[in-house]
Amino acid sequence: MAKHKEEKTNVMRALEQKGVPYTPHTYPHGDGEAPDGVTVAQNLGINPAQVFKTLVTKGASGGYYVFDIPVAATLDLKKAAKAVGEKSIAMLHSKELLPLTGYVHGGCSPIGMKKQFPTVFHHSALDQETIFVSAGKIGFQVELSPADLMKLVRGTAADVTAAAE
């Protein structure tokens, strides 16, 4: 009888290669359909403040930047630009995401992109014992220490979200 092999993503393999402890999690989704982050948190039974979405932007200088913020938050483009020393930044179009990062919309992770871009985490990540980020594929998340994650991607922390209304 064949053993059932647990599916691993490139993100999980990268974490193992670097010796970074993590816990894998899966959640239900439609075929090729990316649920919003709050739904992911609900499906995993965790506080949405622990689940971070990965957003990729392009600065006025032409440089690319990655921002990881809580799933219920909205990126403040002015604060984000200031955090990376740009005059302005804009969200990357979905069609540009896969060729640039190797990830699809809804499965983008700060870990294991084709090229490592400057990465900024919302400062609230540091208040959590663990955070969840995409494991590089829709339906998969990894839970790990924010300090380990920031060290791995050489990330910084700043207030880059819009004020809650």
Q: Which sequence ranges carry the predicted segments?
A:
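Extended, low-hydrophobicity, polar/charged segments
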Residues: 1-165
